[in-house]
Amino acid sequence: QQQTLAGLDTLNVLCIDNDAPYVYQKDGEPAGMLIAILDDFAERTELNLSYTFCEDRTQAREYLTNGSYDMRIGAPLTSGTCAELGFINSAPVIQSVLAYVQNPTSSGSGTIAVMSGIEELINTEGYDNTLIFDNTNECIQAVESKKADLAAGDRSVMEYYIYDNGSTLVTSLIPGQTQNVSIAVSRETDATLLAVLNNYIYSISEADLAGYLSRGNLHSDSFSLLLFTRRHPAQAILSKIVVMAVLALVNFLPANRAAKQRVAMQEQHNTQLKEALQIAREA
């Protein structure tokens, strides 16, 4: 792979922010599943990466018009839109399920919010109005403010921002609807890059993929615990009591086992001593 990409040195990667757990910024640094995969890919191929972040798809088009980028990640593109922008999608990193997000206090179903770029994946025929937003977080906020009755998009992304916002929205799967999460590679970049990248993606095991996704979700993992505590204080207190009891039991069992071992050893020693004294008397 290093020899194949010998003509390349630095890859310029355009990242669309607010697409956690796949692509986002954490404390000003690139983060997310796709970032982690590209970092490891660059390390293996001895390439350098230069990440540039933009806010949404609209701004991404401006960046692509005014600059040159080898890759584009975040807010996955369908093959048609990808080709229109002069890119080719890599092999799917993962296939993510699509879902609805709904406010449990809302009884309406006339307006649906959808992220720009995936409209063709969502059947909106049964709704009176369709609102198009630049990112998933804006779709969620539209449902929270009741501008929309529900939103549709990538389940992992929506659940990340539901946790992140401390929201009470609920998700439900859209049966049979999925989207590929891929890395878009520019047609102007050396064609061998796409082939080598695809080979690398195919080589990633299911366990490693789960690890990459987990790294992308680190922010929401701690928040989900906070969210559970906030929403269910009584259960949280009970859970804490149970955990403390389990820890006490775990600490007690080894100590109790060690004490029993000491008693057994002492009894064995006493038995051996009695036998030795008995032998001495008989002699």
Language-model-detected regions and their locations in the chain:
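Extracytoplasmic small-molecule ligand-binding "clamshell" domains
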Residues: 1-80, 121-122, 128-133, 141
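Sec-exported extracytoplasmic/periplasmic mature domains
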Residues: 42-47, 65, 69, 144-148, ...
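Extracytoplasmic/periplasmic, Sec-exported soluble proteins
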Residues: 26-33, 52, 56, 92, ...
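Alpha-helical transmembrane signal-anchor helices
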Residues: 225-273
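Conserved HAMP-HisKA connector
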Residues: 278-283
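Extended ligand-binding regions for polar small-molecule ligands
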Residues: 1, 32-44, 106-120, 124, ...
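Membrane-proximal low-complexity regions enriched in glycine and acidic/polar residues
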Residues: 91-104, 108-177, 183
